[in-house]
């Protein structure tokens, strides 16, 4: 694909598997019942898609569609080889900046966007997925706002026969799945000493942590959100976190994801009183700290972020994951751990001539947003 923005399109490794054209099939599902009908196959495909993140799990997408989806807008592209599902693009029709586009399901609540792709069938699956999308009428561009390095979406972009654009997007911060002492060793000696003293303070207080079982996960998320809102009382908070649809989506998704080992809801108790809770998403390679809440006065007693980071690191090691992702944002409370920054990209795949104007507008708005947030020119060159 021709790419805007310069640079080489990064992608996960491609493996060629020859299969007669007659053994391939592709379609775009518009019937919202199709999402539920493909549940088992989408779960299986996720397991075979090493680049996918928890935001591409069936449970996350189905719960989101149930509370946010608009009837008639689903565009779920699927590819089969010899009858087996080997690729899927969970998209929906929408309008951005006045342009008709296809966007990922749950984009507003997800830190990463991607397609599902079985690497055994990469070349053929990408080719047929591309053709199925281009044959679908009524849109000028696919707009993927948060694409991780090495994502399947980069493979699709690399083979896209029409114009494709990239622009820098959010920064995500990552730590290796080491013990908390190893993380503290990354800090200046005096700072590390203070953090170790804070850990001893947590332990002396006897704060315990429990991973909630699947049958309690939904209720636990409702409690977590109450703690989250109490924690932010009197300060600006994401308005979506106050809405019933967000609460319902998160609770429903968590129940299925905890059951399948794709998430954990951690509850912290002090003298048997619930004082904090943490929703951690568990991907193929990383665990991601998605949302937490704590009673307001807990910060006066212990370092809450340190307490949760220690447990998230332990969870990553227990699940044999490479590390902990602090997900989007480079806030100071994350940067103090000296994590590795990983830059997402916005990938735009053009279909018709207006895509160029859409991409130019999107890139301009991204630069202006970057200046507002960081007081410097945008990172895009």
Question: Where are the model-predicted features located?
Answer:
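Active-site/acyl-donor-binding loops of N-acyltransferases
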Residues: 10-32, 149, 153-182, 319-381
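Short catalytic-loop micro-motif centered on adjacent basic/acidic residues
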Residues: 141-144, 210-211, 323-325
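ATP-hydrolysis module of ASCE/P-loop NTPase motor domains
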Residues: 134-151
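Short, Lys/Arg-enriched N-terminal segments with co-localized hydrophobic residues
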Residues: 1-8
């Amino acid at each position: 694909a021709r790419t805007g923005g310069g640079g080489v399109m990064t992608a996960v490794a491609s493996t060629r598997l020859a299969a007669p054209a007659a053994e391939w099939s592709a379609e775009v599902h518009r019937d919202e019942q199709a999402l539920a009908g493909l549940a088992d196959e989408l779960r299986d495909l996720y397991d075979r898609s090493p680049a996918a993140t928890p935001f591409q799990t069936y449970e996350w997408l189905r719960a989101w569609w149930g509370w946010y989806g608009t009837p008639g807008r689903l565009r779920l592209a699927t590819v089969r080889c010899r009858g087996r599902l080997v690729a899927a693009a969970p998209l929906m029709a929408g309008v951005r900046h006045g342009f008709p586009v296809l966007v990922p399901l749950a984009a507003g609540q997800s830190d990463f966007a991607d397609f599902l792709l079985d690497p055994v069938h990469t070349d053929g699956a990408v080719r047929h997925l591309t053709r199925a999308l281009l044959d679908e009428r009524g849109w000028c561009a696919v707009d993927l706002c948060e694409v991780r390095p090495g994502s399947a979406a980069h493979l699709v972009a690399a083979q896209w026969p029409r114009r494709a654009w990239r622009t820098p997007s959010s920064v995500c911060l990552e730590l290796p799945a080491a013990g908390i002492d190893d993380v503290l060793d990354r800090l200046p000696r005096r700072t590390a000493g203070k953090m170790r003293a804070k850990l001893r303070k947590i332990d002396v207080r006897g704060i315990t942590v429990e991973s909630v079982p699947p049958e309690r996960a939904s209720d636990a998320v409702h409690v977590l959100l109450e703690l989250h809102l109490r924690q932010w009382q009197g300060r600006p908070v994401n308005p979506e976190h106050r809405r019933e649809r967000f609460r319902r989506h998160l609770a429903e998704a968590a129940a299925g994801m905890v059951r399948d080992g794709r998430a954990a809801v951690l509850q912290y108790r002090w003298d048997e009183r619930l004082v904090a809770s943490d929703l951690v998403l568990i991907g193929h390679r990383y665990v991601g700290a998605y949302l937490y809440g704590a009673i307001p006065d807990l910060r006066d007693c212990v370092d809450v972020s340190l307490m949760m980071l220690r447990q998230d690191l332990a969870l990553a090691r227990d699940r044999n994951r490479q590390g902990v992702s602090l997900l989007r944002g480079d806030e100071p409370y994350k940067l103090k751990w000296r994590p590795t920054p990983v830059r997402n990209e916005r990938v735009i795949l053009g279909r018709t001539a207006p895509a160029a104007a859409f991409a130019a507008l999107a890139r301009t708005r991204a630069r202006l947003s970057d200046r507002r947030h960081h007081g410097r020119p945008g990172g895009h060159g």
